[in-house]
């Protein structure tokens, strides 16, 4: 191929080749190169005559094969005879992966290349070019969307796996890094310990040489020298932390570098609740405490230059915060953070403590880092050593020195306990002795809590832990005494005491031995308190000791609850054994976290639910279930549990548990009363440190206050400073009678000796009363009792689980200057009003509203709590008061703060405070709110005397007297609101709802107000663009499949019953026939109405919105749409009926409205002076009742009333005319049982109705009877010479006329005048009536209203247009509950056959279908309801089942075999008859059968009625085992054997059903047998037939064999065995001749023998 790529060369001397030769050589070369892809297209390529080449090459991209090839093409070349001198024809075929454009481009290039190589063989060159072109365009084809999605998913999955692998590798690196870091920390810790050990040895040697010498202030300190102090700093009050919780978390932290100071150091800033910050230079670490997990640093306070010590705890977690923490790990970290942050509140109380034998806490700081939280606490610097050094180096301490140490330890410990602080870890290492020999106690309370938190591994899995300490851990204050005894014993022996039980050496002095026994006795009850130990002879040796040692005084005031309580360290620990804990719901479900408060009522404890992890406040109250107040307690708990409002503390659960506890006069319960003050005052300790503000127990903590802590007094400055007052003079509300109105949620406000008004704890009897008297003696006179004996008694505790509020109280907020923030002030006030409006609506009164009872949660929202005096009674009398109450009211404690009594007295309303008996209502809370609102708007009052004076001036009976600095201009609105609230006349005082609607309150603020403003502006401009946009967005919402399914799921439950539908149709047809007899026509009104607030002021209609945003209503009843229709069409005369659906909205969102079927019958007439239409309406309902025997049995009564008479009664009872509509609504809700009696009374109280007026109103509305019987009551109204008499006469005249007309119409029902009937009074004028029967439901008789209506002339003009003229017609209407009639008939009238058709036409075979169709058409023409069976292939059994299910009596079988005849089957009275009838006579035959059937049913109904009447009159007795015959009626014995227990009414219904069903058969059998019994069972028809196989006449063995065979074939063997046993008993034992086995499930029976 000369000139071609790869062509063989030709020599110069060789002759030139011919065209065929050249062509043949090229083809051979191409075939060799391309092999199978080469194809010679010549038909005779091997023939003698050579044709020009015509070949096809299948070409692929060069060098690619298999899956890499995405393109290919066939190159077809047809050469002319003179090729290659003439260009061949080139074609590209079967292109794959190339677009048409690419193919055309390739072809044009090939043609150009062919022209270029003309004269040379070129096919290989062309093929090579094609392959190169294919290589350039070898690209995968575009994928489908599905393939791209799969590929994308695969890539994402691959990426996810790579990312997971990368994270795993990163975590592995972090773990390895952390392990390395921990190893380095351990090495550093070992170094520090070695250095500390050396320093301790040096200090110990120095202290042994001279205990009285002073140490160099600049010398090194070890862990034994834990404190050093500066007198200036101790006396500097500005560094004490206050109760501010939010700013304390805003810590600043910085590190000094070498440029700032000569040596590198850390600077810590402590926020002290003021603009000034305490700056402390953190120095060298001087030691550590492994037990408490802390590090100790020297520090310098820059403001005074004094030395302080810095304690540091570090909570470290293994991983760094970030995306590599699991959600569970993050929750654990958050939990630990909250626990640490909660310690700040406790520290606020501890910082206030000051005692010569207690080391002072100064300030606290929290520092959050990426992988840890650092807690720094500044403490007083003490120059001295710990007692641990004495144990290590000095040996035993002499007794005289030990006595001195013990007295100081007891003094400090008693001071801590008197302030409700428990040390928890008292040991030699945290008791210091300074240079003067003074003992100092440190590390109390908070150190143990922080140590427990920081020692816990955040990511540690739950496992069994073993304590390193062999000695048991004792909790509470008695635990501190236990540890004190061990400490003293160790000091006396010179070594640690690790023996348990503790053995006291006999070589110790006798008084010291006895002292130690009082400390380390195993029984907590017998262990003495520090107060008692201070009086022990070891501390106070006496020259003459009595022969019989006296027991310390009774410890009634002892506190068994610590301040901050770790898990299982609460007061219950000492009294509840481990076995009791295992069966206690409280200990099983909750983990105790903290005591929130306690008092005479019990204790409130912060707990965490182990299941949901949420925190709750649990109130634990000792109760006596046998007491008369226990029912009252349960009622209050139930009442409060119903409250659910965002501004009310939520009560969740309540339960009672029984526990065993030690009993005795010296052992109060764990939740006993507070600590008495007398002994502390006697020792010279300031009362202000032990009561009121300085109570640490009450101080734990403000951010996490309980929702209902009821040990508060309003005189405290903070919720964190509440402590229960004791003694008769410190009660809060002595005017409240606990027996009548108080309860478990209130404090004991009476003296301790008045036991009748308190809750009875445990088993209180005469002994306990005398014990209380003895305890009073101990308090007042200091007399002592002997040690009690150890006994046990059962105690019951009521546990109440409540919502837990975290922040503070309104008292805290007021004291912090709430008056400056006006916006927040009004917002909180509005939230208080919202909460009060809610509880008042529920019929409750708080009665103890004050700032400390109003809590603020973490979101700064109000939560009203402390329902200690809350009550659900209508009105209360302030009965007898204490004569000296006034003197007690204005009294302050030595600290300058008010007592609890002052707090309540300053807020209580005049009607409650009055000395005379007077009723009061919810408005007493509004008066208290007035005082509260003044305090919110006024600057905090510093002294108690100022506050008493200002608030008493504000309570002036004439008008409130405001302070001069309460500016009129700035506080104008506040003054108006306060004056309105503090009106001494309750009637002029507003309700919470009225005040919320008042213009005196500014609108809601912030985002809520802005949103409301935008929505209001948009909705007012219905033609604006914004309105259309909002509507478009609303109607473009997507409905999810879940909502679509659940919207009407309760309606479409699959419980459709054809019989129910047919019964409803039967009822409607029957009622319509009655209406038509009265000349009524059917008239249905439009479905939708525009929303009408005036008409539906009370009734809640189902509201919807159309596409334009207009609100429309579905009909609530059929009366309003008809009145609108009459008014708009000027109808003057019409009788109409209508049966339509009415709707009720659901309380749940996104649910289909509830549908009811209602029937309306109305008479509109132009005659205005006749009462005959009213009587006709009532008579029509009477006819309906008579039509249905099921309704006759219910004994309906007709209730009548008149709107004029009702109005006269309300006006007579003192109800203003402008409030009549509200009273109508309340009375209507009461009648329909929408409101309880308590709620009704509460709503009346809100209308300022006096108790006398309310009693008079009840006297009238409860009257019901004949008109003559009520005349004395009605005449009392007529005697009045006011407009009321005219109203009464008008109403009485109408009632007399209607009653007379009803008698003339022959109505046999009882007609009663019901003065309390208030059926839709706003819509009616004149006579109103109801048909009422009392039926038994759930063991009580409840009224069922079948129909109700009245005259509604005045309703029509409300719908007339402005141009409408002409007279207003008289309109009377009644609404009938169709659903109730259908249900009654369905349940009581099983004998009524209601068929959807008279005749079923069946084609026997497909060939007869045409005849069947023609026959059916003739039946329809004749007016006979007929159906044709669509499926001609039905079997006989299926046909019978279809007829039975649809209650079809007659079947016409059309078959070609019968010729011109039709076979008619009849299913009548369990008899099947069959008759051949000519096809032409079928219509007449069926008409005759139907007439006969109607007659038989009428006779059967009458017989059934007679039977039912005989049954009701007791004419036969099943118990006698006999039956009686009344004429031709047989009354057999009927036994109902059901698989489950049946109610009496259901059993009677089945018995009546059986007797009616088998009446004909029984009459026929009466002639043959006199002993007949019926056994009714709940089995299907098929099973009934199986019983025919039983052997009755054989022996017992044969019978049992057939029973086993029967049971083996059927399910429900247990029930079937009972049926068989009963049958055998009837046959063998009773020897009954005839037994019917009847299935009340399928209405089928068989005669067994």
UniProtKB/Swiss-Prot annotation:
GO terms for cellular component: cytoplasm; cytosol; cytosolic ribosome; nucleus. Pfam families: HGTP_anticodon2, Pkinase, RWD, tRNA-synt_His. The modification N6-acetyllysine is found at residue 1259. Residues 705-717 have a biased composition (Polar residues). Autophosphorylated; autophosphorylation on Thr-899 is increased upon amino acid starvation and in UV irradiation cells and inhibited in presence of IMPACT. Residues 1022-1493 are annotated as: Histidyl-tRNA synthetase-like. The active site is at residue 848. It catalyses: L-seryl-[protein] + ATP = O-phospho-L-seryl-[protein] + ADP + H(+); L-threonyl-[protein] + ATP = O-phospho-L-threonyl-[protein] + ADP + H(+). SUPFAM superfamilies: Class II aaRS and biotin synthetases, Protein kinase-like (PK-like), UBC-like. GO terms for biological process: adaptive immune response; cellular response to amino acid starvation; cellular response to cold; cellular response to UV; defense response to virus; DNA damage checkpoint signaling; GCN2-mediated signaling; learning. It is found in: Cytoplasm. Residues 25-137 form the RWD domain. Residues 237-249 have a biased composition (Basic residues). Keywords: Acetylation, Activation of host autophagy by virus, Activator, Adaptive immunity, Antiviral defense, ATP-binding, Cell cycle, Coiled coil, Cytoplasm, Disease variant, Growth arrest, Host-virus interaction, Immunity, Kinase, Neurogenesis, Nucleotide-binding, Phosphoprotein, Repeat, RNA-binding, Serine/threonine-protein kinase, Stress response, Transferase, Translation regulation, tRNA-binding. ATP binds at residues 596-604, 619. Its EC number is 2.7.11.1. Widely expressed. Expressed in lung, smooth muscle cells and macrophages. Residues 296-539, 590-1001 form the Protein kinase domain. It is an enzyme of class 2 (transferase). Residues 146-205 form a coiled coil. Residues 731-740 have a biased composition (Acidic residues). Metabolic-stress sensing protein kinase that phosphorylates the alpha subunit of eukaryotic translation initiation factor 2 (EIF2S1/eIF-2-alpha) in response to low amino acid availability. Plays a role as an activator of the integrated stress response (ISR) required for adaptation to amino acid starvation. (Microbial infection) Plays a role in modulating the adaptive immune response to yellow fever virus infection; promotes dendritic cells to initiate autophagy and antigene presentation to both CD4(+) and CD8(+) T-cells under amino acid starvation. It is linked to Pulmonary venoocclusive disease 2, autosomal recessive: A disease characterized by widespread fibrous obstruction and intimal thickening of septal veins and preseptal venules, a low diffusing capacity for carbon monoxide, occult alveolar hemorrhage, and nodular ground-glass opacities, septal lines and lymph node enlargement showed by high-resolution computed tomography of the chest. It is frequently associated with pulmonary capillary dilatation and proliferation, and is a rare and devastating cause of pulmonary hypertension. The histidyl-tRNA synthetase-like region and protein kinase domains are necessary for eIF-2-alpha kinase activity and eIF-2-alpha-mediated translational control. The histidyl-tRNA synthetase-like domain is necessary for binding to uncharged tRNAs. Kinase domain 1 is a degenerate kinase domain. This is eIF-2-alpha kinase GCN2. The lineage of its organism: Eukaryota, Metazoa, Chordata, Craniata, Vertebrata.
């Amino acid at each position: 191929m000369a000139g071609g790529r790869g062509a063989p060369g030709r020599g110069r001397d060789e002759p030139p080749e011919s065209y065929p030769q050249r062509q043949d050589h090229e083809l051979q070369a191409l075939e060799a190169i391309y092999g199978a892809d080469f194809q010679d297209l010549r038909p005779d390529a091997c023939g003698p005559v050579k044709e020009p080449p015509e070949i096809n090459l299948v070409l692929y991209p060069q060098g690619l094969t298999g899956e890499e090839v995405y393109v290919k093409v066939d190159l077809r070349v047809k050469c002319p005879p003179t090729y290659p001198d003439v260009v061949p024809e080139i074609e590209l075929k079967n292109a794959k992966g190339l677009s048409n454009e690419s193919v055309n481009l390739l072809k044009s290039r090939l043609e150009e290349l062919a022209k270029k190589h003309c004269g040379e063989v070129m096919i290989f060159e062309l093929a090579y070019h094609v392959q190169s072109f294919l290589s350039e365009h070898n690209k995968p084809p575009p994928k489908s969307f599905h393939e791209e999605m799969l590929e994308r998913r695969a890539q994402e999955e691959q990426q996810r796996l790579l990312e997971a692998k990368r994270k795993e590798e990163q975590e592995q690196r972090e773990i390895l890094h952390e392990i390395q870091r921990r190893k380095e920390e351990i090495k550093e810790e070992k170094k520090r310990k070695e250095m500390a050990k050396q320093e301790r040895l040096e200090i110990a040697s120095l202290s042994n040489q001279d205990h009285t010498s002073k140490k160099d202030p600049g010398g090194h300190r070890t862990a034994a020298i834990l404190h050093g102090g500066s007198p200036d700093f101790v006396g500097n009050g500005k560094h004490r932390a206050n109760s501010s919780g939010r700013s304390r978390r805003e810590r600043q932290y910085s590190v000094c570098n070498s440029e700032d100071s000569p040596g590198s150091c850390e600077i810590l800033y402590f926020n002290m609740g003021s603009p000034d910050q305490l700056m402390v230079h953190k120095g060298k670490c001087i030691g550590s405490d492994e037990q408490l997990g802390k590090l100790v640093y020297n520090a310098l306070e820059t403001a005074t230059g004094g030395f302080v010590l810095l304690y540091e705890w570090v909570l470290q977690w293994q991983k760094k915060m970030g995306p590599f923490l699991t959600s569970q790990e993050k929750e654990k970290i958050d939990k630990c953070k909250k626990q640490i942050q909660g310690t700040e509140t406790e520290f606020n109380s501890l910082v206030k403590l000051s005692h010569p034998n207690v080391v002072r806490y100064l300030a606290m700081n929290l520092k959050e880092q990426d992988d840890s939280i650092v807690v720094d606490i500044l403490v007083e610097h003490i120059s001295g050593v710990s007692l641990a050094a004495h144990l290590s180096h000095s040996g035993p301490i002499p007794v005289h020195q030990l006595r001195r140490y013990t007295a100081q330890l007891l003094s400090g410990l008693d001071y801590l306990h008197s302030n409700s602080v428990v040390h928890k870890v008292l040991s030699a290492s945290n008791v210091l002795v300074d240079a003067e020999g003074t003992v100092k106690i440190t590390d109390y309370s908070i150190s143990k809590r922080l140590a427990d938190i920081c020692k816990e591994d955040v990511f540690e899995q739950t496992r069994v832990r073993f304590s390193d300490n062999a000695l048991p851990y004792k909790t509470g204050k008695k635990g501190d005494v236990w540890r004190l005894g061990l400490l003293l014993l160790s000091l006396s022996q010179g070594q640690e005491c690790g023996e348990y039980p503790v053995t006291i050496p006999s070589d110790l002095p006798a008084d010291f031995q006895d002292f130690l026994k009082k400390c380390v006795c195993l029984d907590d009850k017998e262990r003495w308190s520090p107060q008692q130990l201070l009086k022990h002879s070891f501390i106070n040796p006496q020259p003459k000791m009595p022969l019989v040692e006296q027991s310390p005084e009774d410890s009634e005031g002892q506190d068994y609850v610590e301040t901050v309580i770790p898990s299982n360290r609460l007061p219950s620990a000492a009294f509840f054994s481990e076995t009791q804990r295992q069966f206690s719901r409280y200990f099983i479900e909750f983990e105790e976290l903290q005591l929130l408060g306690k008092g005479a009522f019990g204790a409130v404890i912060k707990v965490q639910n182990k299941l949901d992890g949420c925190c709750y406040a649990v109130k634990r109250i000792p109760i006596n279930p046998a007491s008369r107040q226990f029912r009252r307690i349960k009622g209050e708990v139930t009442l409060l549990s119903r409250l659910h409002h965002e501004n009310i503390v939520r009560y969740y659960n309540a339960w009672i548990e029984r526990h065993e506890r030690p009993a005795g006069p010296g052992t109060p319960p764990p939740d006993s009363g507070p600590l008495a003050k007398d002994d502390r005052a006697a020792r010279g300790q300031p009362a202000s440190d032990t009561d009121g503000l300085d109570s640490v127990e009450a101080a734990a903590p403000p951010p996490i206050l309980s929702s209902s802590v009821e040990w508060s007094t309003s005189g405290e400055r903070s919720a964190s400073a509440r402590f229960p007052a004791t003694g008769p003079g410190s009660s809060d509300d002595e005017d409240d009678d606990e027996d009548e109105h108080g309860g478990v949620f209130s404090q004991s406000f009476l003296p301790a000796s008045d036991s009748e008004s308190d809750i009875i704890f445990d088993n209180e009897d005469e002994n306990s009363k005398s014990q209380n008297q003895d305890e009073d003696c101990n308090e007042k006179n200091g007399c002592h009792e002997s040690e009690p004996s150890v006994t046990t008694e059962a105690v019951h505790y009521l546990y109440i689980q409540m919502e837990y509020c975290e922040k503070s109280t309104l008292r805290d907020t007021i004291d912090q200057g709430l008056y400056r923030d006006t916006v927040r002030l009004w917002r909180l006030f509005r939230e208080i009003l919202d909460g009060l409006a809610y509880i008042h609506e529920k019929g409750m009164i708080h009665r103890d509203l004050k700032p400390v009872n109003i809590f603020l949660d973490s979101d700064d929202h109000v939560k009203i709590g402390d329902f200690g005096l809350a009550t659900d009674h209508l009105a209360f009398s302030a009965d007898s008061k204490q004569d000296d109450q006034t003197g007690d009211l204005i009294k302050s404690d030595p600290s300058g703060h008010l007592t609890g009594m002052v707090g309540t007295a300053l807020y209580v309303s005049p009607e409650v405070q009055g000395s005379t008996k007077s009723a009061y209502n919810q408005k007493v809370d509004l008066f208290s709110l007035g005082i509260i609102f003044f305090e919110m708007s006024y600057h905090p009052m510093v002294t108690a005397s100022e506050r008493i004076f200002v608030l008493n001036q504000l309570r002036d009976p004439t008008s409130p007297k405001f302070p001069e600095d309460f500016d009129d201009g700035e506080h104008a609105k506040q003054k108006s609101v306060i004056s309105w609230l503090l009106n001494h006349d309750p009637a002029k005082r507003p309700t919470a709802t009225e005040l919320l609607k008042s213009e005196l309150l500014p609108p809601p603020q912030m985002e809520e107000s802005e949103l409301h403003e935008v929505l209001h502006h948009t909705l007012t401009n219905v033609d604006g663009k914004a309105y259309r946009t909002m509507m478009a967005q609303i109607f473009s919402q997507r409905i999810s499949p879940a909502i679509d399914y659940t919207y009407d799921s309760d309606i479409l439950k699959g419980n459709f019953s054809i019989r129910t539908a047919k019964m409803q149709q039967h009822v409607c047809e029957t009622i319509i026939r009655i209406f038509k007899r009265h000349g009524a026509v059917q008239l249905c009104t439009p479905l939708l109405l525009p929303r009408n607030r005036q008409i539906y002021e009370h009734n809640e209609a189902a509201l919807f919105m159309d596409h334009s945003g207009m609100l429309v209503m579905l009909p609530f009843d059929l009366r309003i749409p008809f009145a609108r229709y009459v008014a708009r069409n000027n109808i003057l005369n019409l009788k109409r009926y209508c049966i339509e659906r009415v709707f009720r909205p659901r309380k749940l969102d996104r649910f289909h409205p509830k549908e009811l079927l209602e029937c309306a019958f109305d008479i509109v007439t132009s005659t205005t002076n006749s009462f005959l239409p009213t009587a006709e309406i009532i008579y029509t309902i009477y006819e309906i009742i008579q039509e249905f025997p099921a309704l006759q049995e219910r004994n309906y009564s007709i209730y009548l009333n008149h709107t004029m008479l009702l109005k006269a009664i309300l006006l007579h009872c003192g109800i203003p005319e402008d409030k009549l509509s509200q009273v109508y609504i309340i009375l209507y809700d009461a009648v329909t049982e929408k409101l309880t009696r308590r709620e009704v009374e509460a709503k009346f109280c809100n209308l300022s109705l006096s108790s006398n007026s309310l009693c008079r109103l009840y006297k009238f509305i409860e009257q019901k009877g004949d008109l003559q019987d009520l005349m004395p009551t009605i005449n009392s109204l007529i005697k009045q010479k006011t407009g009321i008499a005219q109203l009464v006469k008008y109403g009485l005249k109408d009632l007399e006329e209607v009653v007379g007309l009803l008698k003339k119409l022959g109505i046999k029902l009882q007609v009663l005048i019901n003065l309390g009937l208030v059926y839709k009074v706003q819509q009616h004028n004149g006579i109103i009536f109801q048909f009422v029967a009392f039926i038994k439901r759930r063991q009580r008789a409840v009224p069922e209203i079948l129909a109700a209506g009245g005259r509604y002339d005045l309703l029509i003009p409300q719908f007339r247009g402005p141009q409408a003229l002409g007279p207003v017609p008289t309109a009377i209407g009644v609404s009938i509950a169709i659903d109730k009639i259908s249900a009654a008939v369905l349940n009581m009238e099983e004998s009524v056959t209601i068929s959807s058709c008279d005749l079923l036409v069946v084609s026997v075979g497909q060939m007869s279908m045409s005849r069947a169709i023609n026959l059916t058409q003739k039946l329809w023409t004749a007016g006979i309801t007929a159906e044709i069976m669509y499926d001609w292939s039905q079997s006989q059994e299926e046909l019978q089942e279809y007829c039975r299910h649809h209650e079809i009596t007659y079947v016409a079988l059309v078959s070609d075999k019968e010729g011109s005849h039709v076979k008619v089957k009849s299913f009548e009275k369990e008899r099947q008859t069959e008759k051949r009838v000519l096809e032409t006579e079928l219509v007449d035959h069926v008409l005759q059968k139907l007439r006969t059937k109607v007659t038989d049913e009428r006779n059967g109904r009458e017989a059934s009625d007679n039977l039912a009447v005989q049954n009701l009159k007791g004419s036969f007795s099943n118990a006698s085992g006999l039956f009686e015959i009344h004429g031709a009626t047989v009354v057999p014995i009927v036994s109902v054997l059901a698989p489950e227990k049946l109610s009496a009414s259901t059993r009677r219904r089945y018995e009546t059903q059986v007797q009616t069903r088998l009446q004909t058969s029984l009459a026929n059998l009466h002639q043959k047998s006199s002993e007949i019994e019926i056994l009714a069972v709940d089995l299907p028809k098929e099973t009934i037939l199986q019983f025919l196989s039983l052997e009755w006449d054989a022996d017992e063995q044969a019978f049992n064999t057939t029973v086993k065979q029967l049971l083996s074939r059927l399910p429900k063997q247990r029930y079937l065995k009972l049926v068989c046993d009963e049958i055998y008993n009837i046959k063998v034992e009773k020897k009954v001749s005839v037994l019917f086995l009847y299935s009340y499930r399928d209405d089928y029976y068989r005669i067994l023998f």
